[in-house]
Amino acid sequence: MQELRLVLILVGALAIAALLFHGLWTSRKETSSKFGKKVDIDFDSDVDDEQAAPMRGFDQPKEDVVVQKERKEPAFAREEVPTSDDPLFEGTVSSESNKFTQQEKPTVQQAQPQPQPQPVVQQVQEPTVGRIEPEAKPVAAPVKREEPTISFSAIDDEVLTQPEPVQAKVDIPETSTYLEPEIIIEEPEPEPEPELEEDVIVINVHGMGSDRFSGNRLFNSLEQNGLVFGDMAIYHRHSDLSGAGKVLFSVANMVSPGHFQVPEGEEFSTPGISFFLPLPCYGDAEHNFKLMLQTAQMISSELGGNVLDEKRDMLTPNKIDEYKQRVKVFCRK
């Protein structure tokens, strides 16, 4: 549909253009047929009349020189005037022909060119300058001048004895070297880290039910696991198995006042014992904690007891991890 519409529009536009062109062509043809019957006019006479008209009423002065050049006009052939049926055109043509026949061609006289006046050159006489003779000056009597005799030896002596030029001493001030003061930037002292509060890791070993640990059997188990009876009447684990060196952890009686009555032997008994590791401690805290846990488990298995936490509850893996986290805080320091 769109293509058909475009084709129709183009065809309509071409038809309108053809109609317009045909109308213009016919109107031109009619006008040319009406105005084509013109009388040939002698353009030479018209031009001559136009040039001669302004000169008829005036007398030209004789001094003016008029030079008329021959103009080469195109020659137009006379055509026969076609007869027209229109009475209006016949009247105009006849009147124009009569008018042109009545007019006479003016005669133009060629004036002889006069010689142009040559400019007069005036000669200017230059003024003559006379020689002025200087006045005669009185002549004075010649005076005899005695020229002094110059001895070169004296000049040489003077040259030799001339004092040497004295060089002026100029005190040049010493330039003082300006040293820029060193800028010392004091580094801020690190703030002291807050001291950690002391902590204590406690592991208890308790007898089964109402069982109690007897004295000799308990003391032998403690000594076999590297514990030594010492200060405060309790057992200690030292850095050296011989009992010398720093204390790593200690074992006390679960019953107050917490010390052991070793001399009593078989008469001594207790429901349980407590292992405790003070923090911070000597050496590696993690290593000391592992050693204390292993020792408590060994003694518990030998005596037939249970390993409990600080609240005397069963020691679970989660509780052991909590102990390890508390120990790591002191290991970083």
UniProtKB/Swiss-Prot annotation:
Entries under HAMAP family matching the protein: ZipA
Membrane-side (Cytoplasmic) residue stretches: 27-333
Membrane side Periplasmic: residue ranges: 1-5
Bias type Polar residues, positions: 92-107
GO cellular component, one term: plasma membrane
Oligomeric form and interacting partners: Interacts with FtsZ via their C-terminal domains.
Gene name of this polypeptide: zipA
SUPFAM superfamilies documented for this protein: Cell-division protein ZipA, C-terminal domain
Family: Belongs to the ZipA family.
Biased composition, class Low complexity, residue ranges: 108-119
Name by which UniProt lists this protein: Cell division protein ZipA
Function comment: Essential cell division protein that stabilizes the FtsZ protofilaments by cross-linking them and that serves as a cytoplasmic membrane anchor for the Z ring. Also required for the recruitment to the septal ring of downstream cell division proteins.
Main location: membrane
Residue ranges with Basic and acidic residues bias: 72-81
Keyword tags: Cell cycle, Cell division, Cell inner membrane, Cell membrane, Membrane, Transmembrane, Transmembrane helix
